[in-house]
């Protein structure tokens, strides 16, 4: 049934749902930053998604949703590797090196890489002049963020300390990995229920993250009792607000609003993350950050306005 044929929900419900995917998801980047100050990054990431995945999976089971088949579990593990191990793994790791607001801006390039995936992998998108300009704007934005200084001629230079190169590259790899997963999800067998599919993927991702964390030796010398209440609050926020409430609001909005309108979270989240990082985390907010962020967000706005398809992957767990 089309969105226009459905009974429109109460306006306040729509506003609350948008507030969740705009502001709750935007604040998750700062919560990650808080957590990885005390907990090893991949272990903290694993704790989040094991907990969230288990709760979502049990929720889907309680609703009598059909259990994933063996093939669907294999698909879930493949997507979970790309989304949770690579994308989120690099995000949590990078936030030890890169301000949370900058991390959010760099990850806002995901729509650009998704567009490239649709061109290269799916063949459902053409490289038009408008898309080319949008992609170049996104690249320029990241280049500005990573540069040491920018000579503006008579206007002077945009200087300041550059962001950590390894952290920035890790975030870009994560964005590319997410875009590949989004393209593959349209071809892989997955549970019909978005709730069950998301729960399975988060569980699979959390399990793999635990294994990678252990292999990297993150557990050695780490003691849960030494973790402060602030870090635990950050974890609870990520599980219940970021993953569960955010996912619920996102799926609900997809049933009541156009995908293009719902997709606007992609360029609101970075702004929220930068503001929160500046005011609560004391993160730098210079002219170069504003300029680079402007280019990235201009790219995101252009690309998301061109794409009106419902995502096949639960974009889900912010």
Annotate each PLM feature:
Residues 43-54, 83, 88-130, 135, ...:
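Specific alpha-helical transmembrane segments that line the substrate/conduction pathway
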Residues 56, 109, 117, 129-150, ...:
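Hydrophobic transmembrane alpha-helices of multi-pass small-molecule transport proteins
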Residues 13-17, 43-58, 78, 131-144, ...:
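Hydrophobic alpha-helical transmembrane segments of multi-pass integral membrane proteins
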Residues 2-7, 49-50, 58-60, 148, ...:
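C-terminal-most transmembrane helix of multi-pass membrane proteins
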Residues 30-38, 93-96, 146-163, 216-230, ...:
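Membrane-interface helix termini and inter-helical loops of multi-pass transporters
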Residues 28-39, 51, 88-98, 106, ...:
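Juxtamembrane C-cap of transmembrane helices in multi-pass membrane transport proteins
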Residues 35, 44, 48, 94, ...:
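Hydrophobic/aromatic residues within transmembrane alpha-helices
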Residues 24, 28-29, 55-107, 143-144, ...:
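Specific transmembrane alpha-helical segments of multi-pass solute transporters/efflux pumps
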């Amino acid at each position: 049934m089309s969105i226009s044929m459905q009974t429109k929900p109460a306006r306040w419900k729509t506003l609350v749902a948008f507030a969740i995917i705009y502001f709750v998801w935007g604040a998750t980047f700062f919560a990650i930053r808080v957590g990885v100050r005390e907990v090893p990054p991949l272990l903290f990431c694993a704790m989040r998604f094991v907990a969230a995945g288990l709760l979502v999976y049990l929720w889907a089971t309680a609703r009598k949703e059909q259990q994933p088949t063996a093939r669907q579990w294999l698909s879930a593990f493949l997507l979970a590797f790309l989304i949770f191990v690579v994308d989120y793994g690099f995000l949590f790791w990078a936030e030890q090196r890169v301000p949370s607001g900058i991390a959010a801006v760099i990850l806002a390039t995901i729509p650009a890489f998704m567009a490239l995936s649709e061109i290269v992998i799916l063949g459902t998108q053409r490289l038009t002049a408008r898309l080319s300009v949008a992609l170049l704007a996104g690249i320029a934005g990241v280049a500005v963020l990573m540069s040491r200084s920018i000579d503006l001629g008579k206007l002077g230079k945009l200087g300041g300390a550059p962001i950590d190169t390894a952290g920035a590259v890790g975030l870009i790899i994560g964005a590319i990995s997410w875009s590949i997963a989004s393209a593959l999800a349209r071809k892989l067998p997955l549970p019909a229920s978005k709730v069950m599919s998301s729960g399975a993927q988060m569980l699979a991702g959390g399990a793999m993250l635990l294994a990678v964390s252990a292999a990297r030796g993150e557990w050695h010398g780490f003691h849960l009792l030494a973790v402060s209440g602030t870090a635990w609050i950050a974890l609870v926020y990520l599980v219940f607000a970021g993953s569960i409430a955010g996912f619920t609001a996102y799926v609900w909005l997809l049933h009541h609003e156009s995908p293009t309108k719902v997709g606007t979270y992609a360029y609101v989240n970075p702004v929220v993350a930068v503001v929160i990082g500046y005011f609560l985390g004391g993160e730098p907010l210079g002219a170069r950050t504003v300029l680079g962020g402007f280019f990235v967000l201009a790219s995101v706005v252009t690309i998301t306005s061109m794409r009106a398809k419902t995502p096949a992957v639960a974009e889900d767990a912010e």
